[in-house]
């Protein structure tokens, strides 16, 4: 789902800094490290593991060997929970972490820890502030989820056979993912925050481009088979089996999911299901608090 770019930037910086703490923070001479500094490192390590394991996709792209960081990979691969309730829980969790962060006075930290403390504080504050704007973020548009998912999956790294199985499981979950997206969009509409018709129209065009591509030129087919061919640990029979499985999932799961999403969006285009005149607005800045959202 599309997110505020500043919020995403903070998340990326925070992730890098926390991972650096795991790699280097605890490796310093322990006799020269204060008790507070050790506790701070343990706190950051715990936060790092929590953020890294949010969903299978994030975990896979961020870390090649999660177990080396003490992170247990989910038994069932998942995109994570994209519901507004989950986003609100994330904001509540950020409040809890911020209070824990404040138990570490910066005067007792090293120079590097102080920098991490400051950036983590900014990130948590950004997350907390984002709660009132949760429904302002549309899952559609130029870089919305329907166009982003094929690109993201096409870049999913195959290091071993488990990666392939996890990938196919994620492909299989695209229908459920789109159901979450439509539920979120309906919640936005019920709150009188309506995606403009031109945004929905652009999204439908993206879906048509994806559906109209030939099988050989489909990104989820072409990229999958290229990555599969580069994995030397598989036999030709295994590769053929996974290739057939992937194509079957695309035909029986992915295409119908995109068709269903397209139909749902076509129904919503131009409809007036809101209780106010917001259905005529074409920019978020025209909504109440819309300009504040962009400033945020």
Predicted regions and their residues:
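Hydrophobic membrane-insertion alpha-helices, especially the h-region
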Residues: 15-19
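Short, cationic/aromatic linear interface patches
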Residues: 1-2, 20
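Bacterial N-terminal signal peptides that target proteins for export
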Residues: 2-13
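N-terminal maturation segment of proteins
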Residues: 27-296
């Amino acid at each position: 789902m599309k997110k505020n770019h500043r919020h995403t930037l903070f998340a990326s910086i925070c992730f890098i800094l926390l991972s650096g703490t795991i790699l280097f923070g605890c490796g310093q001479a322990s006799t020269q490290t204060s008790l507070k500094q050790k506790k701070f490192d343990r706190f950051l390590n715990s936060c790092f593991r929590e953020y890294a394991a949010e969903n299978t996709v994030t975990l896979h792209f961020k870390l090649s060997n999660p177990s080396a960081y003490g992170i247990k990979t989910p038994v069932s691969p998942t995109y994570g929970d994209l519901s507004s309730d989950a986003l609100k829980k994330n904001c509540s969790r950020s409040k809890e972490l911020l209070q824990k962060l404040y138990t570490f006075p910066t005067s007792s930290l090293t120079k590097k820890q102080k920098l991490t403390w400051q950036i983590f504080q900014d990130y948590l504050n950004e997350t907390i502030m984002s709660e009132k704007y949760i429904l302002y973020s549309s899952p559609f548009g130029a870089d919305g989820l329907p166009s982003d998912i094929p690109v993201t999956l096409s870049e999913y790294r195959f290091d071993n056979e488990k990666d392939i199985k996890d990938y196919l499981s994620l492909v299989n979950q695209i229908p459920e993912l789109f159901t979450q997206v439509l539920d979120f969009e309906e919640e936005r509409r019920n709150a009188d925050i309506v995606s403009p018709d031109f945004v929905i129209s652009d999204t439908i065009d993206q879906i048509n481009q994806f559906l109209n591509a030939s099988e050989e030129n489909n990104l989820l087919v072409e990229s999958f088979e290229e990555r599969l061919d580069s994995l030397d640990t598989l036999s030709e029979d295994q590769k053929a089996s996974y290739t057939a499985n992937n194509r079957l999932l695309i035909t029986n799961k992915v295409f119908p999911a995109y068709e269903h999403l397209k139909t749902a969006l076509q129904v919503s285009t131009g409809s007036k299901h809101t209780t106010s005149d917001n259905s005529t607005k074409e920019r978020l800045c025209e909504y109440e608090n819309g300009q504040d959202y962009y400033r945020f």
